[in-house]
Design a protein with these regions (language model features):
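Conserved catalytic-core segment of NTP-binding enzymes
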Residues: 10, 55-71, 88-90, 156, ...
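Beta-strand-loop-alpha "switch" segments that mediate conformational coupling across diverse proteins
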Residues: 37, 54, 78-87, 227, ...
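Pre-Walker A adenine-sensing motif
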Residues: 113-125
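Walker A/P-loop phosphate-binding motif and the immediately C-terminal alpha-helix
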Residues: 126-169
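Active-site signature of alpha/beta-hydrolase-fold catalytic machinery across serine-
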Residues: 148, 152, 175, 283
């Protein structure tokens, strides 16, 4: 008879129960890492400095035996379950670690999605206010909103840099920039040229201004996915996200961002992110110290996908680091029965934030907690509203943004955005 299956989702619970049931780990062991590898099997990794310590070895063997008993196919035989490794290796695997018990941690080795495990400040100080336009699903108007926001901010005297980082589905630049105004190079060009030390040579030739911005007091610079000619776009795209021997992909993105900010000296940077839960999107949400506009529609599939992300932040103790930089956007708000739709949307957003990111107001130490009622104005779950209109429907040209059309669709959104900007994002406070 086959043993009952122990599914992947039960590993954490079983690891916690197994580790907490054992006697205390000897202090001489230092930190103990339970490493869940790419196959989902769990081994113990500790410093090779304790390899000859009999008391430490006995404690590790007890833990390895218990893990083998409770993890099923995700466990390994006791004799293969302990690895003595260098301190340098232990340091390299600590990103996203979760505490099982004092001095015992579970860590994951991943092919993708590892950038969702941390929420950090950039290694270089930024001067401009940054906003990431993100969604778990595509087709919700992020490109149009980036163009409208740039238009609005430039009309009010701001210098704006817009970066098209949706590199798998580029379209912002072609929608906003006329062919004769597109720059020689784009973001994909910088990433491949920077690999051979030529990044700074293309920075000055990879932004351009849309024609409609020339009459404004401010300025708009668009950094497109590719230049005037796309060239070998797929070959370049295949090299964009690679980690180098010196810098991982998020740090390379920081270098590009800082170089463009130094070149264009913007007041505001708008980052159009890739949609979905891939690492590529994670870097623009968690790693660039931007305020994140979360585009959503009132559909169960949207809320389900956002719950996956929010639950991950909650389970990995990242809620406090990320929640103050989030604002939900009601994208594609319908023309008819709008009030009822927005009520349902706000309730769905409140459920999402309340269940995963807001503090429990019933807790005795929650007097200063981060929590909001359903109808609190300007709370993270209180949506910035974009109304669907025929004038800004899919495929509409953004070469000539008409004030009347923008006002009809975006008046409420822009008013809320201005209040958000005046309040300042966490990185500006």
């Amino acid at each position: 008879m086959r043993k009952p299956i122990v599914p992947f989702d039960d590993i954490w619970k079983n690891v916690v129960n197994a580790a907490q049931a054992l006697e205390p780990i000897p202090d001489a062991l230092g930190d103990v890492y339970l490493v869940r590898n790419l196959y989902g099997t769990v081994r113990i990794s500790v410093s090779d400095a304790v390899e000859g310590d009999e008391s430490c070895l006995a404690a590790l063997q007890r833990l390895a035996r218990r893990l083998h008993e409770v993890l099923g196919a995700h466990g390994v035989l006791q004799e293969n379950g302990i690895l003595f490794v260098t301190d340098a290796f232990l340091k390299s695997i600590q990103g996203g670690k979760r505490e099982v018990r004092p001095n015992v941690y579970l860590v994951d080795r991943l092919v993708t999605a590892s950038d969702w495990w941390t929420v950090g400040e950039p290694p270089f100080p930024g001067k401009a206010a940054r906003y990431t336009l993100y969604s778990v699903k595509g087709g919700v108007g992020r490109s149009t909103t980036a163009a409208v926001l740039a238009w609005h901010l430039a009309r009010n005297g701001k210098r704006v840099l817009v970066m098209d980082l949706d590199l798998e589905s580029p379209g912002l630049s072609s929608a906003v920039l006329e062919p004769d105004r597109r720059p020689d190079y784009g973001i994909t060009d910088w990433f491949v040229e920077a690999l051979v030390g030529q990044g700074e040579q293309v920075i000055g030739r990879m932004t351009a201004a849309p024609r409609w911005a020339q009459d404004f007091d401010g300025d708009v610079r668009i950094a497109p996915a590719h230049g005037r000619e796309s060239g070998e776009y797929l070959a370049k795209l295949g090299r964009v996200y690679m980690d180098t021997d010196v810098d991982p992909w998020p740090v390379r993105l920081h270098r590009l961002l800082m170089s463009l900010e130094n070149e264009c000296t913007p007041d505001v940077v708008l980052l159009e992110s890739r949609s979905g839960l891939h690492d590529i999107a994670a870097a623009t949400v968690t790693d660039v110290a931007a305020h994140v506009l979360l585009f959503a529609t009132d559909s169960e599939s949207n809320w389900t996908d956002y719950r996956i992300l929010f639950r991950h932040w909650q389970q990995h103790d990242l809620a406090e680091q990320i929640r103050e930089r989030l604002s939900i956007v009601s994208a594609l708000t319908p023309e008819f029965d709008t009030e009822r739709y927005l009520q349902r949307f706000q309730e769905g957003a409140w459920d999402l934030f309340r269940d995963h990111l807001y503090d429990d107001v019933e807790a005795p130490d929650s007097a200063d907690g981060f929590s909001f009622d359903l109808d609190d104005d300007d709370a993270p779950h209180d949506p910035l509203v974009i109304h669907w209109t025929r004038g800004l429907a899919a495929g509409a040209s953004l070469h000539d943004l008409k004030h009347s059309t923008v006002s009809l669709a975006y008046a409420s959104f822009l008013d809320r955005f201005d209040r958000l900007a005046r309040a300042g994002s966490p990185r500006e406070q």
